[in-house]
């Protein structure tokens, strides 16, 4: 579907499904006072930290952050810009980096004198100047606690300029800032103020950044993610891009792919393309189509329901959410969760051990935060080898996937790489009352595991959730179950839980463990030394 965007005037009112007239974003944005938002993204943050700590230039050094002690399938957490310039993506798997560098060096060898390398270097400038050098790169082991410390220092720099209520920490390396009230104070343009902050971060930490400036949060994110790629960097590698609604429509209504845009994943893009919508311009034009036309907003609402409104707003470059809205937001429901991707396919019994370990930790997290839950959810993803007709290795030995009438005949889905894989198992169970009892929660989770997980399939991903969590001290009026555990037993269990937490806080998470943590395939001890699934 292709439109020529020589637009008729946007209607003042548009009819939404349900019959009511909708002034929606049109009225909202007409009444909103213009604001100035800044988005700042620290450039290849983890990799830059590792370069700075080694006394190397992050913009001129080939380095990846990855745990090489795992298999080469491990994901690289960061890749330096100089290595990305060879076409290596920022979240490649380590084996993809190895393969890409191998291809690069094959080409370089052809240009080398005598087609032989006389040495190697991870310095980008040296490699450009001397074709006889082999391209090398540094593999840095992740240090998540250190990255968090550096991120905290950089946040402290932001606080020199802005109040906490005007800063939204989006991730460890990215923030949104409402700078509207500060431009007059500092007597600087948005661009100059942004540059001043980034230069201060660079001076104190050695880390540079990319930034986007726009009148709303969505556009400043797009300016940072997309527009900044098309402008030249300064001598420090800094790119600061600006967008408004008109320039966004002019530059990005024909941009493809849709997945480049914030909040548009592969699933959403696929559903849009199935409807004949390939660009943000297509979506915007569809949203103002007349009811009798093939493309109108009903098409979007039938596909996405209420979420179509967000998609339409973003297609036009609108975003009604403000920094104040973010700070005031309180979720209507809360949950606590733990997930992990296993290093190898796990058979049923070993996968059950993993779920037991994770449930044990989930309960301790509840106790530590003073929370209780009355609903548990378990999601289990199977390994791709279950859909293969060949022997495959699982923890503890080999398993031959059966062929013929006894082979796996259940529903099949596809993974990120398009490989067939059995449909994941997913289920929930309700507890008789809100609780943080290890015994009650673990028993319920084990029963759920037995109910939903196929015993003849190997497992690769596990996700456990405590849903409907509330503060324990808010339950004074809750009716208790007549068959609940005696108060004395509950008191002893709580004392044990609190003792375990106290020991771990003082001496580390591995200071006190359970017997199951030493069984073959257990992962708790290793995970206790990680942050976010990576080495602390």
Where are these regions (language model features)?
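DNA-contacting surface of Y-family translesion DNA polymerases
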Residues: 39, 260, 270-458
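Gly/Gly-Pro- and Ser/Thr-rich, intrinsically disordered tail segments characteristic of DNA damage-repair
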Residues: 2-5, 9, 13-323, 479, ...
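C-terminal hydrophobic structural anchor segments
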Residues: 447-502
């Amino acid at each position: 579907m292709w439109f020529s965007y020589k637009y008729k005037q946007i209607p003042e009112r548009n009819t939404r499904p349900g019959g009511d007239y909708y002034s929606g974003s049109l009225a909202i944005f007409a009444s909103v006072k213009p604001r100035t938002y800044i988005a700042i993204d620290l450039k290849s943050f983890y990799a830059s930290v590792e370069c700075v700590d080694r006394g190397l230039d992050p913009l001129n050094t080939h380095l990846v952050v990855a745990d090489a002690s795992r298999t080469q399938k491990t994901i690289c957490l960061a890749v330096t810009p100089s290595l990305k310039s060879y076409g290596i993506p920022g979240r490649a798997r380590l084996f993809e980096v190895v393969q890409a560098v191998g291809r690069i060096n094959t080409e370089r060898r052809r240009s080398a004198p005598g087609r032989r390398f006389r040495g190697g270097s991870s310095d980008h400038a040296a490699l450009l100047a001397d074709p006889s050098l082999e391209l090398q790169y540094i593999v840095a082991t992740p240090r998540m606690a250190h990255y968090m410390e550096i991120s905290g220092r950089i946040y402290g720099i932001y606080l020199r300029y802005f109040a906490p209520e005007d800063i939204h920490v989006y991730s460890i390396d990215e923030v949104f800032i409402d700078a509207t009230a500060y431009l007059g104070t500092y007597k600087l343009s948005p661009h100059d103020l942004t540059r001043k902050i980034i230069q201060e971060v660079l001076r104190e930490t050695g880390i540079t950044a990319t930034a986007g400036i726009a009148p709303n949060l969505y556009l400043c994110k797009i300016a940072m993610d997309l527009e900044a790629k098309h402008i030249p960097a300064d001598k420090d590698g800094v790119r600061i891009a600006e967008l408004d609604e008109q320039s966004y429509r002019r530059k990005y209504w024909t941009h493809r792919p849709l997945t480049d845009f914030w909040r548009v994943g592969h699933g959403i893009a696929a559903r849009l393309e199935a409807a004949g919508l390939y660009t943000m311009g297509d979506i915007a034009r569809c949203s103002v189509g007349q009811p009798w036309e093939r493309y109108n907003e009903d098409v979007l609402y039938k596909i996405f329901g209420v979420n179509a409104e967000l998609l339409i707003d973003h297609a036009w470059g609108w975003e009604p959410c403000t920094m104040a809205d973010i700070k005031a937001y309180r979720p209507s429901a809360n949950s606590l969760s733990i997930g992990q991707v296993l290093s190898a396919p796990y058979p049923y019994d070993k996968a059950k051990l993993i779920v037991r370990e994770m449930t044990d930790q989930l309960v301790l997290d509840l106790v530590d935060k003073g929370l209780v839950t009355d609903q548990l959810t378990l999601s289990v993803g199977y390994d791709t080898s279950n859909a293969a007709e060949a022997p495959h290795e699982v923890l503890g030995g080999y398993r031959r996937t059966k062929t013929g009438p006894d082979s796996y005949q259940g529903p099949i889905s596809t993974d990120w790489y398009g490989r067939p894989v059995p449909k994941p198992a997913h289920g929930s169970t309700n507890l008789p009352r809100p609780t943080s009892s290890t015994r009650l929660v673990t028993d319920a989770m084990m029963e759920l595991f037995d109910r939903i997980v196929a015993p003849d399939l190997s497992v690769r991903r596990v996700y456990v959730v405590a849903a409907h969590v509330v503060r324990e001290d808010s339950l004074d009026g809750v009716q208790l179950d007549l068959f609940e555990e005696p108060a004395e037993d509950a008191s002893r269990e709580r004392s044990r839980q609190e003792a375990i937490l106290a020991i771990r806080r003082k001496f580390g998470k591995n200071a006190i463990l359970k017997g199951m943590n030493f069984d073959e395939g257990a992962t708790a001890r290793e995970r206790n030394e990680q942050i976010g699934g990576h080495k602390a």
